[in-house]
Regions:
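Phosphate/nucleotide-binding beta-alpha loop and adjacent structural elements of enzyme active sites
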Residues: 1-238
């Protein structure tokens, strides 16, 4: 019997993204493995991939045996490419419906308004605007094993103080790329998010970074001078 082909390969469709974008994705997934620090997707995990793009992380989650994966992506073109890249999870798999359960959701999570021409290169946006708790309620996802976030500034609204109790008790692990300059007012938004969300979780010793010095740097008044424009934050509850 033929073995199951791996979904995360160098033959994935890239949806005509620029060479710089593909190089960044390749480096973050294959080289630095940014989303694998401190926790990797385990068999039977429930995975929520916010900012799924062309499906690289979701493909990795599927290859690792995730029980269910939700791909949330505001760009229809990228989401359709992600579905294509994950087609192997369904085609010629008689157990796909029972075992795989990959769901593609055309939505912008954490955003109150969307200008796709600036953010995703698309002139119009016809998907949903969705909060984390709206997603949890609508799709009946009471617990999340791995919450991956790459949302270009919307991470502050996803990991919002109003969601803190859910994040602390119902999400096992969060791997989030934080952007300091992805939107106007980003500095003040980060400071508020740092004080209302990150600090309480840091006090519980649940926050991790790729660089241990960031624990101190994020709390400094001159954090913009000390931190890169984007960096990874991990919240590990158990």
């Amino acid at each position: 019997m033929f073995s199951k082909p791996k979904s995360l390969t160098f033959e994935m469709d890239t949806a005509n993204l620029s060479i710089n974008e593909i190089a960044h994705l390749h480096h973050s997934i294959f080289v630095s493995k940014d989303y694998d620090w401190w926790y990797e997707v385990l068999p039977e995990d429930i995975v929520v991939d916010v900012g799924a793009g062309i499906g690289m992380f979701s493909a990795k989650a599927y290859d690792n045996g995730a029980k269910r994966t939700y791909m949330i992506e505001p760009s229809r073109k990228l989401l359709e490419t992600a579905v294509k890249n994950l087609a192997g999870a369904y085609i010629d798999r008689p157990d796909a419906y029972e075992r795989c359960r990959i769901k593609a959701i055309h939505a912008a999570m954490g955003r109150t308004d969307v200008d796709c021409s600036n953010v995703w290169g698309e002139p119009q946006y016809d998907g949903k605007l969705m909060s984390l708790m709206e997603f949890v309620d609508y799709y009946d996802v009471p617990n999340i094993s791995f919450l991956k976030i790459s949302a270009c500034g919307a991470e502050y609204n996803i990991l919002h103080e109003d969601n803190l109790n859910f994040i602390a008790t119902n999400v096992r692990h969060t791997a989030c790329r934080v952007y300091l300059n992805a939107q106007y007012g980003g500095v003040e938004k980060f400071k508020h998010w740092r004080d209302s969300v990150l600090k309480p979780m840091m006090d519980l010793n649940r926050v991790y970074f790729q660089d241990d010095t960031y624990h101190e740097k994020v709390m400094q008044d001159n954090f913009m001078e000390l931190l890169p424009a984007s960096f990874m934050v991990y919240i590990k509850n158990w």
